[in-house]
């Protein structure tokens, strides 16, 4: 019984404390008892909850660059945020790399087989191969050229179709975040382009494109690829270490 009285006393104290925080004087709260206290407390608690919700909605609206007065309820705000997210996703920049062989000897199957082969090779092996091609005066295998483009996600499909219709094979599609896939694309360029100056040009263009993307991972990969381009001595332990990527 004593515990019940203590619990009730503490609950009354908590309610009166809230009323004081809502602007009631201690003198006024002392006069409130029983049902009257409960009625006033519920009203003030409800008002506080509404204010907190309104503040939360307003803060989130501001974070998304929206007007708090216009989007003043979850029902209005959340669908608008979802719409913005979808629009941002459609506008997200994508990096596309295409290759065309002048002789017509390479096709999509060649690229597929090349990528498949690299799935069984370590990064250090692929990197060593790239450095070897960079140091080789001429490639006696293929005569080709490369196109590197950045487009919004909504345009990826039609851009792929456009370049395919011009005889190009896609060798990379993504946001520049996957270093292994980028290395495979680079090695494809090394194998597929005859002149070393042209290979240098494409690699420098790729690094610049990666740096321009709004993704930290892409910028980090640009630095790693630049290191490959600049390196004079190849260290297997370095390129195999996942901490670098």
Curated annotation (Swiss-Prot):
> What GO MF terms are annotated?
nucleotide binding
Localisation: Virion
> Where in the chain is the site Interaction with the viral DNA polymerase?
172
Q: Please give the GO cellular component terms listed in this UniProt entry.
A: virion component
Motif annotated as Nuclear localization signal, chain positions: 4-55
Please indicate which superkingdom the organism of origin belongs to.
Viruses
> What are the alphabetically sorted keywords of the record?
Covalent protein-DNA linkage, DNA replication, Nucleotide-binding, Phosphoprotein, Viral DNA replication, Virion
Phosphoprotein among keywords: yes
Q: Altering residue 202 to F: what's the impact?
A: No effect on DNA priming capacity
Q: Spell out the coiled coil positions from the record.
A: none
Q: Quaternary structure?
A: Interacts with the DNA-binding protein P1.
**What is the role of this chain?**
Acts as a primer for viral genomic replication. DNA terminal protein is covalently linked to the 5'-ends of both strands of the genome through a phosphodiester bond between the beta-hydroxyl group of a tyrosine residue and the 5'-phosphate of the terminal deoxythymidylate. This protein is essential for DNA replication and is involved in the priming of DNA elongation.
- Protein's name according to its UniProt entry: DNA terminal protein
State the species of origin. Answer: Bacillus phage Bam35c
């Amino acid at each position: 019984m004593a515990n019940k009285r203590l619990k009730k006393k503490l609950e009354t104290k908590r309610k009166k404390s809230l009323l004081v925080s809502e602007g009631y004087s201690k003198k006024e709260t002392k006069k409130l008892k029983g049902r009257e206290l409960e009625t006033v407390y519920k009203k003030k608690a409800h008002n506080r909850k509404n204010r907190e919700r309104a503040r939360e909605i307003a803060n989130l609206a501001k974070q998304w660059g929206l007007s708090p007065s216009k989007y003043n309820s979850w029902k209005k705000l959340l669908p608008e945020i979802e719409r913005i997210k979808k629009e941002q996703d459609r506008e997200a920049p994508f990096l596309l790399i295409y290759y065309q062989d002048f002789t017509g000897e390479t096709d999509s199957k060649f690229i597929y087989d090349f990528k498949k082969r690299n799935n069984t090779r370590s990064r250090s092996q692929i990197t060593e191969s790239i450095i070897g091609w960079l140091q080789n005066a001429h490639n006696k295998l293929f005569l080709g050229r490369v196109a590197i483009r950045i487009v919004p996600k909504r345009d990826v499909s039609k851009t792929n179709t456009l370049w395919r219709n011009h005889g190009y094979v896609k060798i990379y599609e993504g946001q520049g975040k996957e270093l292994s896939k980028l290395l495979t694309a680079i090695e494809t360029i090394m194998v597929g382009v005859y002149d070393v100056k042209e290979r240098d040009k494409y690699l420098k263009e790729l690094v610049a494109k990666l740096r321009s993307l709004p993704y930290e991972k892409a910028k980090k990969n640009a630095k790693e690829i630049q290191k490959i381009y600049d390196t004079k001595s190849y260290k297997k332990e370095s390129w195999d270490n996942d901490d670098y990527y």
